[in-house]
Amino acid sequence: MIEAECITKNFGDFTVLSDVSLKVKKGEIYGLIGYNGVGKTTLLKILSGIYRADSGTARINGRSVYENPQMKQKCFFMTEEAAFFHQFSLNKMRKFYSGYYPKWSDETFKGLVEWFGVDPVMKISRFSKGMQRQASLILAFSTRPEYLFLDEAFDGLDYSMRRQICEMFRYYVETEEASMLVSSHNLKELEDLADHIGMLCDGKLAFDGSTKYMRENYQACEFIYKEDMSGLLSVRHELLEIKKCVNEEYRKNRY
């Protein structure tokens, strides 16, 4: 289980995260929604052991990941940036990653290369943005991680490919009993994928509940989000933006 307890992180005088707590259970996909700059990437970096929290604790199965190479070998953090060297091919990146991750699977690598239809000998710098995102996913899942941290995983992918990748995510998490934390600024993407949703706003977790609850009680979720943001000048604008992200079907069911 991935667990954050009262996480706070500052950069100078700026507080990026304030008292954030969440849990991602085994076999669960947790979706973290929030606008750009609210601290999503920072939280993922803390939970995956890249950053150290200023206060609070980040643990996986009760153990800290920060400065813990053994635990990091069970994790994969895919950022918005590339998970590869641009002048390398996928085959060269395979050699790079297989030397670090003990559970690396050539079988998974070959299967995903074929499934995505990318050229494993071409320099990744020649790939389109969408193909580069696919390359990152190939490398991520070939490490056979127990804990996945995906930052804006669908960036650059078309709708059809997003649907297929969602199915792949769900299949992997279910069959491997993995834990996945995926962030996005698009609520619809996460609503279709995640078992659990967390709404990060102004460095705090405004809502933390099951996707099923959010679907069935949209007004309650909106109320919770509004209460949490009652002191901000941009409440009305941000609530309108959240509404735009919600499927029209759920709007109709509100009445």
Please report, for each region that a protein language model flagged, where it lies by residue.
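The feature captures the beta-strand-to-loop junction immediately N-terminal to the Walker
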Residues: 33-35
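Helix-to-loop junction immediately C-terminal to a conserved catalytic motif
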Residues: 48
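Conserved ABC transporter NBD signature motif
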Residues: 56-71
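ABC-family P-loop ATPase nucleotide-binding domains
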Residues: 79-132
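Catalytic Walker B motif of ABC-type/P-loop ATPase nucleotide-binding domains
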Residues: 148-152
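Helix N-cap at the start of a conserved alpha-helix in ABC-type nucleotide-binding domains
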Residues: 159-161
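ABC transporter nucleotide-binding domain
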Residues: 166-250
